[in-house]
Amino acid sequence: AMLATGAACGTSDDSDASASKSSSKSSELTGYDVSGVKKDDAIAKMLPDYVTKDGKLTIGMDTSYAPAEFLAADGKTPVGFDVDIAKALAGVFGLEADPETANFDSIIPAVGAKYDIGISSFTVTKERLEAVDFVSHFNAGSAWAVKKGNPNKVDTSDLCGKKVAVQTATMQETAANKMAKQCKADGKAEMDVISSKLQTDVTTNVVTGKADVFYADSPVAGYAIAQTDGELETLGKTEGIAPEGIVVKKGDQQMDEALQKALQKLIDDGTYMKILKYWGVQDGAISKPEINTPGTNE
C-alpha cells in the first residue's frame, strides 16, 4: 500500500525497480492460461467506442511488484495475477490485452487517454476517487514475516530493539518509522528501520539476518515467503485489509459497468479464483466487484 496520489501498492516512481530483479524461481512463472476465456457479446456491447476501436484493451501497470505485476525472465513480458485478470477481462470483451509498463504515478493521469484502464495494485481511496473511477477486484492488507520459528522472538506489538525491513515509499515504511519514533519517545531500545527500493532486497534482509522482520502488503509478503522455500513464515494475521481496484476514466459509467459485469462473470465461472490460486493469493479474493467504493478504514 503506497503513499501519495500516485501510489497504492507498488514501488515509488523510481523506474529502475521496473527492471524487476525477481528471483529465478519467480521469473519462471508465466501466468495462468486464460486463452479459454470466451467473448461475451452482451458485455462487449457495453464498452465505449474509444476502448473497442483498435481491438485492444490497453492497460497501464508498474511491472515491479510481484506477484501482482512484474516482468518475466526475458525482462520484457508482464506477468502476475493482475496481468492475468486483465487478459481474462480482455477475453470477455473480445479484445487483445495490451499491458504496458509505466511509472506508478503516471498511470492514473493517463487512463482514458493513453490507457483504457490501469491495473497496478491501486488501493481504492477517497482521494483517488476524486480523480478516477474504480472497479474493485482484490483485497489486500499488510503482513509481517520472520525467519521460520521466529528465532528472534519478534512481537509485533513491541518492536523496540528490533530491526524492521520495509520497501521504500510504502505505507508500511511510514508505519514502521512512526513505531520507531514512539520507541524513542518512550525511552525504549531503538527500533531500526531498514528501507530498500526492491521487495526482493527486503526479503533477503530477513533471510540473511540483517533484519528481524519485514512488513509488506499481504500478497507481496505471501509471495515473497513462497520464494524462500520455507525459510520465512508469516507472523500474526493480515492487518488493515482494503480493496484494490481497476482504474477507469472519471465518470465513465459505461466502462465501469462493463468491467463490473465482466469481472463478475470471471468470478462466477471460476476463472478468477483459478488465477489467484495459481499465484498463491486466493486469500485476497472478492465475491462481488464494486464501483467507486473505498475501504472502510478510509
Question: Where are the regions a protein language model picked out?
Answer:
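Periplasmic-binding protein-like
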Residues: 138-146, 226-264, 282-298
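Bacterial lipoprotein signal-peptidase II cleavage site
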Residues: 5-21
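Ligand-binding clefts/hinges and TM-proximal coupling segments of bilobed small-molecule sensing domains
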Residues: 30-49, 174-193, 264-298
